[in-house]
Regions:
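Class I S-adenosyl-L-methionine
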Residues: 1-120, 131-133
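Short, Lys/Arg-enriched alpha-helical microdomains
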Residues: 123-126
Length: 133
């Protein structure tokens, strides 16, 4: 599947961890898709000429996923909870949705990190723990 997006939106989709553009869109799309940035499109390619640049992105469905998330809606909700307070530490949000035993199952996790400091796999683990309840 190939789509064209506004450059800024596209950067949020294909950004990798860690980067300043990394966030909800990156995490959710990368769960199901391999994402390949193809090329940028100049505003001069359109009439009337827009004030923005565009990017073409190729989405390739993943055949094998390392995490099996049964309810993708939970991943959307979890990333929404964390990234709505992007500059806050994860400890309060994590304690709202998981008990201490579940938090320990995630592994060696520093609760003073911010949402953008967590790799996508951590969000997949959290979602998996929520789904198993």
């Amino acid at each position: 599947i190939i789509f064209m997006f506004q450059k800024e939106v596209g950067e949020k989709i294909y950004s990798k961890f860690p980067s300043s553009k990394y966030g909800r869109l990156s995490i959710i799309t990368k769960y199901r898709l391999n994402i390949v940035k193809k090329f940028f499109v100049s505003p001069n390619c359109f009439f009337p000429k827009p004030k923005i640049n565009s990017v073409v992105i190729h989405f390739i469905p993943k055949i094998q996923k390392y995490y099996k998330i049964e309810n993708l809606k939970n991943l959307e909700e979890i990333t929404n909870i964390f990234f709505s307070n992007k500059r806050k530490m994860i400890n309060k949000n994590l304690k709202k949705i998981l008990n201490m035993n579940d938090i320990k199952k995630i592994g060696n996790l520093d609760l003073k990190l911010r949402p953008s400091d967590l790799e996508p796999e951590i969000y997949y683990k959290i979602t998996d723990l929520i789904n198993k309840r």
